[in-house]
């Protein structure tokens, strides 16, 4: 700050606006609802920048968002790169060695190529960073009791601090703007995001400076309010000024967070949402071999990139394989149906043993699965975190995470269903900092099981049920299979994993494609993305129905299955079965019924001409009678009118009595 306009008293005052500032900041800070699972690991880089927004210092690590707040230790001279000329580093490149020769000790000639005595007094306006001697003097200034440095916040400061100025005064235009630093009055604040202090003591910094290296390391720590802020991606700015006699040299520095997803996201095609609309690929026939078959473990070949039809067919095939291995009697003849409306998946809570990892497993860095929420979870299983009372019915065992930072990976065939979404692994740091909770579940696609008679009756239109038959889903038939829960006839371990291997692969592929669809929809239709996704699944099933690959039963798309597997041309199979039932039905009909069934055109002709014939017959029968009545009515009316007309043209003569005439005479 300028000594010509401002005095420099020792600071021991408390800002009376402090409590109000805390309330304002708490009212403004709220966690950002990011489009990622809070347990997903990202590559995070905290960067310290100079006035030109060039990165001059950085630290990198792999952590979940908003859980890693390391101490930042840049050098004071690094912040002055390309800064004001009195720092002497206007032409110094970032991350380059410090300039200038070393300073000389009292014994002349002890340091070859030295310049200036290390003990020479500091003069005003001397560059502070361009030589080892100046850096040593700068270190003594920052550690001196009556000198030091102070830091003022930039644009993120409250409104009452408008008098603090802008970058031209390093945000320190008046006293009271400083919030941290190393000075005799110990500047502090209850609302700023960082604190700044010396990283080295004066005794530690002196030999480092004499060795011609950066020796004015700072320690920048995040405050509690700074750890609550989620605007670090755009960055925040501060001004730093030295507290010396005369003019206070200053500089501008910033702090920002760079977030890099560890997994690649490369779109292919003009529209990633619809680019996978392709016909089903024909299955490859296995090569002919004359060798004697031997028992080998089940291995699945690497499938080609699946389109919509293939993904949905793979779900049905995986469901059939799991059902056939566990309940062969149910697959003698059946229909497996995909539901066109949500929910598309069901969760079954299970008990399992997860694995602990001190470093993030590979699946923790996979693209976020948070966008899929399980609307139906049944059973009782393992819960982690602060489970609310409304969801404690799902918990057989609730485990609290202890202190420390580690990761909980779900066992094979399961996934963590959290209040923030689906994730393959958890970060205990996130669970300890939040009130999140998770349940270990098996994920089953919404595939319903129907008997053949029910399907045939629906298409024939002769079925009359007092109530809708209960639909059996995979979650009811196979729930708990992976962890050896209620599956009858199948043991745990390898057999259970083999039974669900193809189904799990199909579920994984379908979830991945659904996530991609939601991600693309969110970019343009934030509020309507869920509705569009539901219509998308309905259109996918409509494509299958129109292509004859499945039979549409109400809101479901059904595939015929028997011991030969899932039939791809389900409509052809349905027509074949319906024709057989039609022939059986016709064999029991009389000649009159067969007449109509054998000649469809005759039924159409009769129904077409029957109406006009009946109308014509009624006209012929009732027409003459009605016409006579009408003519007679008209004649009667006309005669009455004629009589009225005649009476108006003539007057009635008065009758004369002869006797009266005689009496008058």
UniProtKB/Swiss-Prot annotation:
InterPro entries hit by this protein: FMuLV_rcpt-bd, TLV/ENV_coat_polyprotein
GO BP, sorted A to Z: fusion of virus membrane with host plasma membrane; symbiont entry into host cell; virion attachment to host cell
Intervals of motif CXXC: 334-337
Extracellular side of membrane: 32-605
Residues of the signal peptide: 1-31
Site (Cleavage): 467-468, 644-645
Region of interest (Fusion peptide), ranges: 470-490
Keywords: Cleavage on pair of basic residues, Coiled coil, Disulfide bond, Fusion of virus membrane with host cell membrane, Fusion of virus membrane with host membrane, Glycoprotein, Host cell membrane, Host membrane, Host-virus interaction, Lipoprotein, Membrane, Metal-binding, Palmitate, Signal, Transmembrane, Transmembrane helix, Viral attachment to host cell, Viral envelope protein, Viral penetration into host cytoplasm, Virion, Virus entry into host cell, Zinc
Gene Ontology CC: one annotated term: host cell plasma membrane
Residues binding Zn(2+), per UniProt: 117
Region annotation (Receptor-binding domain (RBD)) ranges: 32-267
Residue numbers spanned by region Disordered: 266-307
Cytoplasmic compartment spans: 627-665
Protein task: The surface protein (SU) attaches the virus to the host cell by binding to its receptor. This interaction triggers the refolding of the transmembrane protein (TM) and is thought to activate its fusogenic potential by unmasking its fusion peptide. Fusion occurs at the host cell plasma membrane.
Domain notes: The YXXL motif is involved in determining the exact site of viral release at the surface of infected mononuclear cells and promotes endocytosis.
Protein name: Envelope glycoprotein
């Amino acid at each position: 700050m300028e000594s010509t306009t401002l005095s420099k008293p020792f600071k021991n005052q408390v800002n009376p606006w402090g409590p109000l500032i805390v309330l304002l900041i708490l009212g403004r800070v709220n966690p950002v609802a990011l489009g990622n699972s809070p347990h997903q690991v990202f590559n995070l880089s905290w960067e310290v920048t100079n006035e030109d927004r060039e990165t001059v210092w950085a630290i990198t690590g792999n952590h979940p968002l908003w859980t890693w707040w390391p101490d930042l230790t840049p050098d004071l001279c690094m912040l002055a790169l390309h800064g004001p000329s009195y720092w002497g580093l206007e032409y110094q490149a970032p991350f380059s060695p410090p300039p200038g020769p070393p300073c000389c000790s009292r014994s002349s000639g002890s340091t070859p190529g030295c310049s200036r005595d290390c003990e020479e007094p500091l003069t005003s306006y001397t560059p502070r960073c361009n030589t080892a001697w100046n850096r040593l003097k700068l270190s003594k200034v920052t550690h001196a009791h009556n000198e030091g440095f102070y830091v003022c916040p930039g644009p993120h400061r409250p409104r009452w601090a408008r008098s603090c100025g802008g970058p031209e005064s390093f945000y320190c235009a008046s006293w009271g703007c400083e919030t941290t630093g190393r000075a005799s009055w110990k500047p502090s604040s209850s609302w700023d995001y960082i604190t700044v202090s010396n990283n080295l003591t004066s005794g530690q910094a002196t030999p480092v400076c004499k060795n011609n290296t950066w020796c004015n390391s700072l320690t920048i720590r995040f405050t509690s309010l700074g750890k609550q802020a989620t605007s670090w991606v755009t960055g925040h700015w501060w001004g730093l000024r030295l507290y010396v006699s005369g003019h206070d040299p200053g500089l501008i520095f910033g702090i920002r967070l760079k977030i890099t997803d560890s997994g690649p996201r490369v779109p292919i095609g003009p529209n990633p949402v619809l680019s996978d609309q392709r016909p089903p690929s024909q299955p490859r026939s296995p090569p002919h071999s004359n060798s004697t078959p031997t028992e080998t473990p089940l291995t699945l070949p690497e499938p080609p990139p699946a389109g919509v039809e293939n993904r949905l067919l793979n779900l049905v095939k995986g469901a059939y394989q799991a059902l056939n291995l566990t309940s062969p009697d149910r697959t003698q003849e059946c229909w497996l149906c995909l539901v066109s409306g949500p929910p598309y998946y069901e969760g079954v809570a299970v008990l399992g043993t997860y694995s602990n990892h001190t470093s993030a497993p590979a699946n923790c860095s996979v693209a976020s699965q948070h966008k899929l929420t399980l609307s139906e979870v049944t059973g009782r299983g393992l819960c982690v975190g602060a489970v609310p009372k409304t969801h404690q019915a799902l918990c057989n065992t609730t485990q609290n995470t202890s202190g420390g930072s580690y990761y909980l990976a779900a066992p094979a065939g399961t996934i963590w269903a959290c209040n923030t979404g689906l994730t393959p692994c958890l970060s205990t740091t996130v669970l300890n900092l939040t009130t999140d909770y998770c349940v270990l579940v098996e994920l089953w696609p919404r595939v319903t099981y129907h008997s053949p008679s029910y399907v045939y009756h629906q298409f024939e239109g002769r079925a009359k049920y007092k109530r809708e038959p209960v639909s059996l889903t995979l979650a009811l038939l196979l729930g708990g299979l992976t962890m050896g829960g209620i599956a009858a006839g199948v043991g745990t371990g390898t057999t259970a994993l083999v039974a669900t291997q193809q189904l799990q692969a199909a579920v994984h592929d379908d979830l991945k494609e659904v996530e991609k669809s939601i991600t693309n929809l969110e970019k343009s239709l934030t509020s309507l993305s869920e509705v569009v996704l539901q219509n998308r699944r309905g259109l996918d099933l409509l494509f299958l129905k129109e292509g004859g690959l499945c039979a549409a039963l109400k809101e479901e798309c059904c595939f015929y299955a028997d011991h030969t597997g899932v039939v791809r041309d389900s409509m052809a199979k349905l027509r074949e079965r319906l024709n057989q039932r039609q022939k059986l039905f016709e064999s029991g009909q009389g000649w009159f019924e067969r007449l109509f069934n054998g000649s469809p055109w005759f039924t159409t002709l009769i129904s077409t001409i029957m109406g006009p014939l009946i109308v014509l017959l009624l006209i012929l029968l009732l027409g003459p009678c009605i016409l006579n009545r009408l003519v007679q009515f008209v004649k009667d009316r006309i005669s009455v009118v004629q009589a009225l007309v005649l009476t108006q043209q003539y007057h009635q003569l008065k009758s004369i009595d002869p006797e009266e005439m005689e009496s008058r005479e």
